[in-house]
């Protein structure tokens, strides 16, 4: 999935996907779209009685997705992957600065996906504050910093990585 993410909108709008969704969606009260945000608005026009939910979406796209939810009455919500971090898919959310460091090739002892708004121990990560701001639930700023050892470098990351920022003023 990570390799196709840059073309996700094109794939979502492919005629084969359209035909499959037309058949499957006809028998559903609510149709869940995984990583197909590009279909939310046009499918509302094509199928005026269809109710859509973003059943799995990329965390960095929350501002785009939530704008669609607020503007389109037929889109009833968005479920970002994922709220709470978990064991498995080790490293999918780990940004890397050298080939072979993060993502799905993260080295041992990496066991967490590292994609949750809440980490495995129950602490909120910066992404959760960004989401809170997008939802209009937070007006105060939330300030994060990047590790200065990577200053000026562009991370290699999967589409599930928002950033490598953290809420701290000290660095190890």
Feature-to-residue mapping (PLM):
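Substrate-binding clefts and catalytic carboxylate motifs of secreted carbohydrate-active enzymes
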Residues: 1-172
């Amino acid at each position: 999935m990570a390799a196709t993410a840059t073309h996700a909108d094109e794939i979502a709008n492919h005629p084969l996907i359209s035909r499959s969704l037309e058949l499957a969606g006809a028998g559903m009260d609510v149709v869940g779209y995984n990583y197909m945000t590009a279909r939310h608005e046009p499918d509302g026009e094509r199928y005026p009685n269809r109710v859509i939910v973003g059943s799995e979406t990329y965390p960095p796209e929350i501002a785009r997705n939530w704008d669609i939810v607020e503007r389109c009455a037929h889109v009833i919500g968005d479920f970002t992957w994922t709220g709470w971090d978990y064991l498995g898919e080790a490293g999918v959310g780990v940004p890397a600065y050298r080939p072979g460091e993060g993502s799905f090739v993260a080295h041992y002892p990496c066991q967490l996906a590292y994609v949750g708004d809440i980490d495995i121990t129950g602490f909120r990560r910066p992404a959760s504050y960004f989401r809170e701001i997008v939802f209009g639930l937070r007006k105060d700023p939330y300030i994060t910093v990047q590790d200065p050892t990577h200053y000026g470098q562009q991370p290699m990351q999967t589409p599930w990585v928002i950033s490598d920022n953290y809420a701290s003023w000290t660095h190890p």
